[in-house]
Amino acid sequence: VRLRSVPLGVVTFLGLLVVIVALTASARSFAAPSAVPAWLQAHVGNADGQISQVVLERARSLYLQKVAQGAVRNPCYFAMDATRPGDLGNGVLGRRYYVVCEASQSFRAISSGHGGGRNLKGTVNFSNGRRCAKNFGNAMDSELTAGGAYMTREAKTSFKGFYRTGAKQDVAFQRTFIQFDGEGEAANARQRVIGGHAAQVLRTMCMRKTPNSAYADHDGMVPFGKLVDYAGGRSNGCTSWSPADARQLISMVKDNPTTLYIYPESRDIAAIASGHSASGTYWNASCLKEIGTPKFWPRKTLEPVIAQYKQDHPAPPAQPLPICKEP
């Protein structure tokens, strides 16, 4: 068989055409949400450790959209179902925060805190219990969880003080915070300082003389406290994780942003509250029985109330921390 030679320019053009077609097909595959793969569908359900269908569908759609836009290259994405219980009793935490990595066919369900809200005594009560969240919202200083679409952003690590271990060693406590940027009703996430971090805090703070410490102030004093783990408790509106989970999640998104979808949004809450659940809307049955009717507090109505309460009940002047009694 006699082969005719093909000009080099034609070969180059054909090669580029193949690449362009391949890239276009790839982009389309991301842009159009594909069916949930069978291995992932096996994790769908309403039991502890499973992810409810509507939560997965919305989280996956958000992720694929951001990948198609070129905003996300991370192979994993996050979701949270804040209608589920955070505490199952007997020291067992509810798993309602999800880490999905489709490329490696990995699915994890872990615990996470929900926003505790506040009780402005004599004015309005939008606080939440430890187990289930009844109140949601996006108002400044409300300490409520707001559902919707988020992107993880920069990591900020800050020194909080020292604490003493069981081995009588003083350890510097530095906590890393992952800032979230939200969309729609969650668009003020940065303004509200909403993000993710370990569920740890220093309590019973005092000042100790440690002049040789790199963290000492101009008087040679450092803050000292008791390290408290509140993984089974409530947050100030952020997603809070156990220390071990926090280390893993922060390493996954540091300098490599991804998406987080938090359920429910205000439309879901309205549907449940009205008793006319729209298609795709759901609520964890155990928590719904406990809380009765959920409520969303929009910022336009709640922020003026909080501002007035602040004005009527000014915070006392900040006092310096006491000197530690123990050496």
Positions of predicted regions on the chain:
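Cell wall/extracellular polymer interaction/catalysis modules
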Residues: 30-236, 244-327
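Bacterial N-terminal signal peptides
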Residues: 10-24
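Bacterial Sec-dependent signal peptides at the C-terminal "C-region" and cleavage site
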Residues: 21-33
